[in-house]
C-alpha cells in the first residue's frame, strides 16, 4: 500500500512540475534568441505562462515546451470571454486558429500549416453573419475568394493564383445583380472590363493591358444609348474622343487628346448633325479662331483665343454674312 501511495505522489509531482504556471513578468529571453526562460534560469522553460490584467483577471495563457510555444495559447477579454485560441507545435503555428468578438461570436477561423495559412479562412460579423471566405495554400490566397454583405448576399468574388488575382473578378449590387466584372492576369487588370447598372444593363466597357487602360472605353445610358467613347493608351486618353447626346444618341462633341490633354481640332454639332462650332486646342487650351456656325452652315461668329484666353476681336454675323457686332479683348479682358 505504501508503494502505491509513493508511486501516486511521484506521478503527481511530475505532472505538477510539467504544468507549472509562471507569471508573464518573470519570463525573459537572452540575446537575439526567441527561446523563453524564467529569469535567472538557464534551462528553457516548459510549462504555462500566465499574463493578467491589472485587476488580476487572466489576459492570456501560453503553453511552452523547451522555451518554445507548444500547445494552446489563449487570450481573454476583460469580461472573461476568449479573445483568441491558437495552437503551436515547437514554436510554429499549426492547426485551427480562432479569434472571437467580445460577445463570444467567432470573428475569424483559419488553419495553419508550418506557420502559414493553409485551407479555408472564414470571417464573421459580431452577429455571426458570414463575411468572407478565402482559400489559402502555403500562405498565399489560392482559388475562389468571396465577400458577403450584411444581408448574406454575395458582394464580390475573385479567383487567385499564388496570392494574386487571376481570371474574372466580380462585384454585385445588394440585390444580387452583377455590378462589374474585370479580368486579371498575374495580378494586374488585363482584358475586358465591364460595369453594369443595377437594372443589369451595360453602363461601361473598357480594355486593360498589364494593369492600365488600353483601347476604347465606351459608356452607355441605362436604355442602351452610347454617350461617350474615350480612346486610352497607357492609362491616358489619347486619340479622338467622342461624346453623344443622351436623349438622341447622336454625336454632340468630338476632340483629340494627347496624354489626357486636348490637342488639335475640337468640334461641336447640332442635333441635326450639322457643325455648330470648331476650335483648335494646344496643351488643353484654346488656340486660334473659334468659329461658330448657323445650322445652315453659314458663319455665326468668330472668337480669337491665345493660350486659352480670348485675345483679339470677337465678331458676330447675321445669316447673310454681315458683321453685326464686334468686341475687342486682350488676354481675356474686354478692351473698352
PLM region spans:
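Glycine/tyrosine- and acidic-biased, solvent-exposed loop/turn segments at the edges of beta-strands
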Residues: 16-336
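Sec-dependent N-terminal signal peptides
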Residues: 4-13
Amino acid at each position: 500500500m505504501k508503494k502505491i501511495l509513493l508511486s501516486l505522489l511521484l506521478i503527481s509531482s511530475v505532472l505538477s512540475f510539467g504544468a507549472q504556471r509562471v507569471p508573464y513578468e518573470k519570463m525573459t529571453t537572452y540575446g537575439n534568441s526567441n527561446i523563453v526562460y524564467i529569469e535567472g534560469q538557464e534551462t528553457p522553460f516548459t510549462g504555462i505562462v500566465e499574463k493578467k490584467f491589472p485587476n488580476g483577471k487572466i489576459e492570456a495563457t501560453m503553453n511552452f515546451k523547451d522555451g518554445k510555444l507548444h500547445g494552446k495559447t489563449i487570450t481573454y477579454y476583460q469580461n472573461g470571454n476568449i479573445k483568441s485560441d491558437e495552437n503551436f507545435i515547437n514554436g510554429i503555428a499549426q492547426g485551427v486558429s480562432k479569434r472571437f468578438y467580445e460577445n463570444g461570436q467567432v470573428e475569424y477561423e483559419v488553419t495553419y500549416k508550418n506557420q502559414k495559412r493553409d485551407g479555408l479562412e472564414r470571417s464573421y460579423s459580431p452577429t455571426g453573419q458570414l463575411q468572407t471566405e478565402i482559400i489559402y495554400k502555403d500562405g498565399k490566397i489560392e482559388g475562389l475568394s468571396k465577400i458577403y454583405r450584411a444581408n448574406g448576399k454575395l458582394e464580390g468574388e475573385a479567383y487567385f493564383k499564388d496570392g494574386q488575382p487571376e481570371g474574372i473578378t466580380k462585384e454585385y449590387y445588394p440585390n444580387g445583380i452583377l455590378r462589374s466584372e474585370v479580368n486579371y492576369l498575374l495580378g494586374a487588370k488585363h482584358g475586358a472590363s465591364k460595369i453594369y447598372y443595377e437594372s443589369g444593363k451595360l453602363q461601361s466597357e473598357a480594355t486593360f493591358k498589364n494593369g492600365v487602360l488600353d483601347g476604347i472605353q465606351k459608356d452607355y445610358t441605362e436604355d442602351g444609348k452610347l454617350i461617350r467613347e474615350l480612346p486610352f493608351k497607357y492609362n491616358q486618353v489619347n486619340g479622338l474622343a467622342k461624346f453623344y447626346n443622351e436623349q438622341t444618341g447622336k454625336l454632340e462633341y468630338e476632340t483629340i487628346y494627347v496624354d489626357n490633354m486636348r490637342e488639335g481640332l475640337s468640334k461641336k454639332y447640332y442635333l441635326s448633325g450639322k457643325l455648330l462650332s470648331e476650335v483648335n486646342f494646344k496643351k488643353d487650351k484654346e488656340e486660334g479662331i473659334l468659329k461658330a456656325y448657323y445650322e445652315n452652315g453659314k458663319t455665326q461668329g468668330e472668337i480669337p483665343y491665345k493660350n486659352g484666353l480670348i485675345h483679339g476681336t470677337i465678331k458676330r454675323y447675321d445669316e447673310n454674312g454681315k458683321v453685326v457686332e464686334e468686341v475687342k479683348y486682350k488676354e481675356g479682358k474686354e478692351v473698352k
